[in-house]
Amino acid sequence: MLEHLSSLPTQMDYKGQKLAEQMFQGIILFSAIVGFIYGYVAEQFGWTVYIVMAGFAFSCLLTLPPWPIYRRHPLKWLPVQDSGTEDKKPGERKIKRHAKNN
């Protein structure tokens, strides 16, 4: 069973994260406004809480899993480069000295 879970994608790109955050905040705000208005009209604070909680659950369902909509812009990594400093011994490296500020 765990083999199936490990094959699921778990990453989002930066634009996908931004979209998920905007959707999350928009759904929460919308449900809070609707919940407040309905709770005020019905004179039941409980309905306000239920509507906001339903909006929260809905927004979590839409934004927490890494749906394909959030992975449209994959990161392009730079190729690995050899750094010349690893081949040198510690005594051969140049030491940078900063000028003293008086």
Curated annotation (Swiss-Prot):
Protein's name in the database: Signal peptidase complex subunit 1
Cytoplasmic side: 1-19, 70-102
Disordered: region residues: 81-102
Keywords from the UniProt entry: Endoplasmic reticulum, Membrane, Transmembrane, Transmembrane helix
One cellular component (GO) term of this entry: signal peptidase complex
Post-translational modification: May be phosphorylated.
Record membrane topology: Multi-pass membrane protein
Stretches of the chain found on the membrane's Lumenal side: 43-46
GO terms for biological process, alphabetical: protein targeting to ER; signal peptide processing
Membrane-spanning parts: 20-42, 47-69
Family: Belongs to the SPCS1 family.
